[in-house]
Regions:
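Bacterial N-terminal signal peptides
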Residues: 6-17
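N-terminal pre-domain segments of enzymes
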Residues: 21-51
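Active-site mouth of glycoside hydrolases
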Residues: 48-273, 396-412, 418, 422-503, ...
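Catalytic-core region of carbohydrate-active enzymes that cleave or remodel glycosidic bonds
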Residues: 194, 496-516, 523-541, 556-722, ...
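Extracellular and organelle-lumenal recognition/adhesion modules and their flexible linkers in secreted
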Residues: 266-469
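Proteolytic-maturation and junctional protease-sensitive modules
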Residues: 510, 840-881
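Long, low-hydrophobicity ectodomains and other hydrophilic envelope-associated domains
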Residues: 652-653, 657-848, 853-857
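C-terminal beta-strand-rich structural cap/linker in extracellular carbohydrate-active enzymes
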Residues: 875-896
Length: 896
């Protein structure tokens, strides 16, 4: 009888599978100790870390003296990097038991490491001692350290840097070119890395357990300039930037006259108006429309200001709450205040729609020509500091952007905004949209869209006196050559910074750890490829803050499952990996309170192993001094989130132990240096440097390995990959991503030693090789189930098997507030301890006789509770999981 017929018989013998509804949620928090039981995989970590030699890169892979190495890491942030000694010992043991073999020390430089020092220039020795002891304990438990040099230190008057609130957050981008900031970065690196750890008795420069050093997190001149955060730099920083720009131009052109000749080619004055009723002199008619949905509550009116008065603006919208904050900069596209208009449109938003972009104000019906410039101008203000968005896009399917998509920072004062953009394609029916209006009051006036607006070198601007201004991201009104020159200037300035810091660390300080600059998508790939390894970050539905950044009362997440979006974050990460270089993802998470978040780490562990990545880090383990809570504390910390922790043995098995095989074929997207520069000239953004922009669909990564090739053969062409339907099967046959049922996607892993299911059940049975999985009724019709053979080569041989099964997990008292669509929030009502969990009813059928199997529910520490019965399906053992056991993990012992 064929294997297929055997399974049919087994399934029929089990009738419809488990039908029991999930009982009430029960408390379950993975214990903070590290007993030697089946859930403790610390034996997989060689001890001490670094005993097998320094990590290095050979043929694009992390290796030590014994062979290839992978990193399954996590992050500690702020004060969590400086625990007391007893806590350092406990956390090191707990991380090791979970299979975590590297800790990224993040946000140390914000305030924590300076301790009692009068400024952020001198490390507090007491803090350094705590860090030293933690790193020592991590090393003893087989855990490497990744040291981040600059994350969130923000210089102020105490360090001799004025105008902090008018500079970019944490001085990012600015620190790529401001000379004294660069010198102070070097001082900090020298002070930290050359000191001798009294517990390991080695300086960090020579410590093999210090595996990685990252120069600056999510920091790049390209990115920060692209966000408009350098548009309104105060002096002396603006002068420094302008002088460096003029020096670069002098080196290229030699004289103002040659510069003028090059830049004035293609200048285009403003043409005829394309919009109607942009001054709101007529009543709202067909020209302007406000898009709403059934949830949207907003009021729109045209107002006229009395003579000599700017027009009254309510302090806040009726029925809304606002938080006032200091306004320090007019924001993108706004060089200064504007005269108050006589007539303006007032939009009072009381409730956003089912999607975050509603309500939105739209005017459509005009045509754009590809590669032609257009200039949008308007005046705008709000009842308090708020953000809005403006875009130019198709007024028809597929609703694609046409060259303009910008955030607008609003204050209570009228500000002029100007955006010059180049149309990305011809379109006969385009539209301008004002959108992302959170609850509040907004006023808009003098809206104009005209072709042209491109200028060359203006009269009075000269290289001899450094008077050629820096190009503002919000005012891309210069000629093609001028824009390209500025992008090339950013490239050269960034390259000199990153490569200069790298040489300082390697040559002057003698750092033996692997050094990375920052993350891809912030900085160009060819620049970051000049360092030791490539790094990236990604989040599935990062929390969004419609108003003030990190406002604990005003945020939402999309409560959606990745399994329903093939590729998602994972294929995009694959599309930025650089062929021939070690690749890590040092931040990844599916943030709370997404109810499907348990899928995140098992999926990226399997996918990363298939893609042959070198390191993956959860973000984060802990952000504070409370290392052992019994509640989920926020979006990111996993320390008390059982849905993420109980699957860690499976993650470590798939990624660290290598249970998931690498792809058999690697697909390369060719991106030469010239091609990357050309894409930056076109888009001005490093976010667009990925395989999908260079002829290879990122979904290829669900079938094969994927990387970008920075040194392609001149004749290289994008490979032809056959399109698949709704089922994506890896070329190894081990990973299946199935979206054949709309809204009912699932992801499975089938290897000899690890099995995984995550997704929607829909009454289906899931064969995982020789193991069969049936899942009963759960609250979301969704679950994540992992199985790991700890000792044996398979599930039919003697040894222990760890099983984890998770469904809904939440704090006691936490209630999601729906905001429309899939958007949800808790505001600041995260609930209280303990974490409450759903017991998943399921049957697991093993390919061994029942008499050979013992089955144990496990307690919060992973210790055995009284044995549960093992049922039979023919000659096969059936493990019955369920809420009656009040646990998320189990142990099966297969006897000889």
């Amino acid at each position: 009888m064929s294997a297929r017929h055997v399974w049919i018989v087994v399934v029929l013998g089990l009738a419809v599978g488990p039908a029991q509804a999930a009982e009430d949620l029960f408390p379950f928090v993975v214990a903070y100790d590290a007993p030697a039981n089946a859930t403790n995989v610390s034996d997989w970590l060689p001890k001490p870390a670094g005993a097998q030699g320094f990590l290095r890169v050979e043929k694009g892979r992390l290796v030590n003296d014994t062979g290839p190495v992978r990193v399954w890491g996590t992050n500690l942030c702020f004060e969590a990097c400086f625990p007391p000694r007893e806590q350092a010992e406990r956390v090191a043991r707990r991380l090791a038991r979970l299979g975590i073999n590297c800790v990224r020390m993040h946000h140390m430089d914000s305030r924590s490491i300076w301790g009692d020092s009068p400024n952020k220039l001198t490390i507090d020795p007491k803090k350094l001692d705590r860090l030293d002891y933690l790193i020592y304990q991590l090393k003893q438990n087989g855990i490497y350290t990744n040291l981040n040099l600059h994350v969130s230190r923000w210089f102020d008057e105490a360090e001799g840097f004025p105008h902090r609130q008018s500079r970019p957050n944490y001085d990012k981008g600015l620190d790529n070119f401001e000379p004294r900031m660069i010198e102070l970065q070097k001082k900090y690196a020298r002070d930290l890395l050359t000191h001798v750890n009294p517990y390991t008795r080695t300086p960090y420069t020579q410590e093999p357990a210090i595996a990685f050093v990252e120069i600056s997190n999510e920091d790049a001149l390209f990115a920060v300039w692209g966000w408009g955060q350098l548009d309104d730099l105060p002096d002396p920083y603006a002068t420094t930037f302008r002088k460096q720009w003029n020096a670069w131009l002098r080196k290229k052109y030699g004289s103002t006259e040659k510069l003028r000749q090059a830049w004035n080619v293609g200048a285009a004055p403003l043409g005829e108006e394309l919009l109607r009723n942009g001054d709101f002199s007529s009543p709202l008619g067909r020209e302007w429309s406000v898009e709403r949905d059934p949830q949207t509550v907003c009021h729109v009116s045209i107002e006229t200001a009395p003579p000599g008065e700017p027009g009254a603006l309510p302090a806040k919208a009726p029925g809304t709450k606002g938080t006032k904050r200091k306004v320090t900069s007019p924001g993108a596209g706004a060089p200064g205040s504007a005269a108050a208009p006589r007539r303006f449109l007032r939009i009072v938003v009381q409730r956003q729609g089912q999607v975050a972009w509603r309500p939105q104000l739209v005017q459509a019906g005009f045509a754009l020509k590809k590669d032609s410039p257009y200039t949008l101008t308007f005046q705008m203000r709000a009842d308090q500091a708020r953000r809005a968005a403006v875009s130019c896009m198709m007024a028809h399917e597929p609703w694609e952007r046409l060259g303009l998509s910008a955030d607008v920072k609003l204050t209570s004062q009228w500000r002029p905004f100007r955006f010059t953009f180049v149309a990305e394609r011809d379109d006969p029916n385009a539209r301008i949209s004002f959108t992302s209006l959170s609850p509040g009051t907004y006023e808009l006036a003098s809206v104009s869209l005209r072709p042209g607006g491109i200028a060359g070198l203006e009269p009075g601007q000269a290289l001899e006196d450094d008077s050629v201004p820096v190009l503002r991201r919000s005012q891309m009104h210069l000629t093609r050559q001028a824009r390209h020159d500025f992008i090339d200037f950013l490239w050269d300035t960034e390259r000199d910074y990153w490569h200069g810091m790298y040489r300082f660390l390697k040559e002057e300080l003698g750092v033996k750890a692997l050094v990375a600059g920052t993350q891809l998508s912030y900085s160009p790939a060819h620049i970051q490829a000049g360092l030791d390894y490539i790094d990236a970050h990604s989040y599935w539905h990062h929390p969004a803050f419609p108003g003030r950044r990190w406002d604990p009362q005003n945020w939402y997440v999309h409560n959606a499952a990745l399994v329903n979006s093939p590729g998602g974050t994972l294929s995009r990460l694959a599309a930025t990996r650089v062929a021939g270089m070690a690749y890590t993802v040092s931040e990844y998470n599916h943030p709370a309170p997404i109810q499907y978040a348990a899928e995140g780490f098992p999926m990226i562990a399997a996918f990363g192993a298939f893609q042959h990545w070198d390191g993956i880090y959860s973000f984060a383990y802990n952000h504070n001094t409370n290392f052992e809570p019994r509640r989920i504390e926020g979006f990111f910390d996993i320390k008390a989130d059982p849905a993420k922790l109980v699957h860690m043995p499976a993650c470590a098995a798939m990624f660290l132990r290598g249970d998931v095989a690498p792809a058999r074929q690697l697909v390369r997207a060719a991106i030469s240096r010239d091609a990357e520069r050309a894409k930056l000239h076109e888009t001005t953004s490093a976010w667009n440097i990925h395989a999908g922009q260079f002829g290879v669909d990122p979904l290829v990564a669900l079938l094969h390995g994927l990387a970008i090739d920075l040194k392609p053969d001149a004749s290289a062409k994008p490979p032809h990959i056959e399109k698949t339907g709704a089922v994506f099967l890896s070329d190894t046959g081990q990973i299946r991503w199935d979206v054949s049922q709309p809204g009912g996607g699932y992801f499975t892993v089938n290897t000899p030693r690890t099995k995984l299911f995550t997704g929607f059940v829909r009454g289906r049975t899931f064969p995982l090789g020789e193991v069969m999985l049936q899942i009963g009724k759960t609250r979301l019709d969704w679950a994540t189930v992992s199985l790991v053979a700890l000792d044996a080569k398979g599930f039919d041989a003697p040894g222990r098997v760890v099983v984890a099964a998770t469904g809904l997990v939440q704090n006691a008292g936490a209630k999601l507030e729906p905001l429309g669509g899939d958007r949800v929030t808790l505001r600041n009502r995260w609930g209280h301890e303990p974490v409450l969990c759903e017991g998943v009813p399921a049957r697991i059928i093993l390919p061994v006789p029942p008499a050979r199997v013992r089955f144990y529910p496990l307690d919060e520490s992973g210790n055995r509770r009284p044995a549960a019965p093992v049922e039979a399906a023919g000659d096969r053992a059936v493990l019955e999981l369920g809420p009656q056991f009040k646990t998320l993990w189990y142990e099966a012992e297969i006897l000889r």
